[in-house]
UniProtKB/Swiss-Prot annotation:
Similarity comment: family membership: Belongs to the DEPDC7 family.
Residue ranges the record marks as coiled coil: none
Residue ranges annotated for the DEP domain, each copy included: 46-136
Alphabetical list of Gene3D superfamilies matching this protein: Winged helix-like DNA-binding domain superfamily/Winged helix DNA-binding domain (1.10.10.10)
Pfam (any one): DEP
CDD domains listed in its UniProt record: DEP_DEPDC4, RhoGAP_BRCC3-like
Name of the protein: DEP domain-containing protein 7
InterPro entries: DEP_dom, WH-like_DNA-bd_sf, WH_DNA-bd_sf
GO BP of this protein: intracellular signal transduction
Length: 511
């Protein structure tokens, strides 16, 4: 039986259901085609936009996987940007249920690994540690292509559920179960270039960060907007030395894959960023007894710690933000600090972000008190903090206490700090939709707490407020019993000279 993914591919949904190829007069409320279109576009968007690559999950390496939190980010962004349900505010929890439905209908599946001898329950998790893989049935590709050739989009809803054991009356029923109601108005949009989308994300991330963190200067953030991503360096042609280095890395990677030890797996992942000579030294000094994991861990921790003690700090950009986040932590505003950290890390380029993610994961595992004892006289958590603090933040304007607090906070929340906040998703979606519809994208940015008014109204408001304040000042002078008659007369005379109209309005012509 074919899966949804094969049937979607056979129908060529990437072209048929792209935003630029919507049918004339399309409305999401149309049944059953409306819901069919939404599901098809969600599947296509997920398959084309989520990052699929080789990842680790509970001690083992798995090919062609994506993480749960990124799937939620992609679908959430797609639903809100395309306004399938009008202006309804879609909570992240609802998107998690959409992902659960897609998993139930075999669009993708959870990576099956055993933890303590038990299979993980097939429940979708919005986590950077939960891995999923798209389902495929290679033997049926040609058959599906022939079988579905010429299938109309209106019949896709029937085909969608034939491959599933789960009973459902229609696609519309599932939307109703999710408490989401489609909009009745047609929605027409055009494709936006990746450059425009990236610029909007960058701009709104900075804008939201400024809303959460009090910064004395904006120079660092303004410079951040001007940063141009560096072009990746071309790979060198293999020679004898490079081949040897490659083999050393391959041997260490193979060793890591063979070990059912999360600590070693996390450490091996960090070796990818170490220079070749250090990797060669690790390989040459590897214990003759590989089962002596204590010696292996001691070697790996020492090498990784040595490299990051001399490396430029990963988070040394936007140093003013460090103080802002640390101040939030000092004041007990953990949730706001977490969102600010998520925004801060969103501004990292992809390479540094991935390197920091691996390092932070290794730090969190190594800091576990039940893991390998790093130093006999010290707690693992304190050792990790001491060794890697300068590799993360080395800010002269940040006190040692705040630096320690920030590093420990990152370690404790390493599963959440790389998620994209739902608030940012909504802000970006509103702006992208405005651009798509040709409206002023700055009219409703999502984080301005005032109402836009025209010039005449602004001028009138200024005059009224000024007049009210002058009348209040005049009343204060007139009713102040502490002023002597001479002093009061002097002040009133000065006021009359400067603002005669206000003076006459208050006292009249009889004064």
């Amino acid at each position: 039986m074919a899966t949804v993914r094969e049937k979607a591919a056979a129908l060529d949904l990437s072209a048929l259901h792209s935003p630029a190829q919507r049918p004339p007069g399309f409305s999401v409320a149309q049944k059953p085609f409306g819901a069919t279109y939404v599901w098809s576009s969600i599947i296509n968007t997920l398959q084309t936009q989520v990052e699929v690559k080789k990842r680790r999950h509970h001690l083992k390496r798995h090919n062609d996987c994506f993480v749960g939190s990124e799937a939620v980010d992609v679908i959430y962004s797609h639903l809100t940007q395309n306004k399938f349900f009008g202006d309804v505010d879609i909570p992240r929890a609802k998107v998690v249920r959409v992902c659960q439905a897609l998993m139930d209908y075999k669009v993708f599946e959870a990576v099956q690994t055993r933890v303590f001898g038990k299979d993980k329950k097939p429940a979708f998790e919005d986590s950077s540690c939960s891995l999923y893989r798209f389902t495929t049935i290679p033997n049926q590709d040609s058959q599906l292509g022939h079988e579905n050739k010429g299938t109309s989009p209106s019949r896709f809803s029937d085909a969608l559920f034939k491959s599933s054991d789960i009973k459902s009356d229609s696609l519309e029923d599932l939307w109703e179960n999710l408490s989401l109601k489609p909009t009745n108005s047609p929605h027409v949009s055009t494709r936006l270039s990746p450059q425009v989308i990236n610029e909007v994300w960058q701009e709104e991330t900075i804008g939201r960060l400024l809303q959460l963190v009090d910064l004395p200067f904006l120079d660092s953030l303004l410079k951040q907007q001007e940063v141009v991503p560096k072009a990746p360096q071309s790979k060198r042609q293999p020679d004898m030395v490079n081949t040897s280095n490659y083999l050393d890395r391959g041997i260490l990677r193979a060793y890591g894959d063979s070990q059912e030890d999360e600590w070693i797996s996390a450490a091996i992942d960090c070796l990818e960023y170490l220079p070749d000579q250090m990797v060669v030294d690790i390989s040459r000094n590897f214990p003759e007894q590989p089962d002596r994991t204590d010696l292996v861990k001691e070697l790996l921790f020492g090498a990784i710690g040595k490299y990051y003690s001399t490396r430029e700090p990963l988070l040394n950009h936007l140093s003013d933000v460090h103080n802002g986040i640390a101040e939030l932590l000092v004041n007990g505003k953990t949730e706001i600090a977490l969102e600010a950290t998520q925004l801060f890390l969103k501004l990292l380029d992809s390479q540094n972000r991935e390197e920091f993610r691996r390092l932070l994961y290794f730090m969190a595992v190594a800091a576990d008190p039940s893991e390998f004892k790093l130093q006999e006289e010290s707690d693992n958590r304190m050792v990790v903090k001491r060794v890697f603090s300068k590799a993360i933040v080395n800010n002269k304007n940040l006190s040692k206490g705040k630096t320690d607090l920030l590093v420990l906070f990152l370690m404790d929340h390493q599963k959440d700090v790389f998620k994209i906040p739902g608030t940012l998703h909504k802000i970006v979606s509103v702006k992208l939709l405005a651009i798509q519809k040709g409206r002023d994208p700055n009219k409703d940015t999502g984080y301005i707490y005032c109402q836009r008014i025209d010039g005449r109204e602004y001028s009138s408001s200024i005059q009224k407020k000024t007049k009210d304040q002058l009348l209040s000042l005049l009343k204060t002078i007139d009713e102040d019993s502490k002023l002597s008659a001479k002093e009061k007369k002097k002040l009133l005379g000065q006021f009359h000279k400067s603002h005669p109209d206000i003076f006459i309005e208050y006292f009249g012509d009889s004064f």
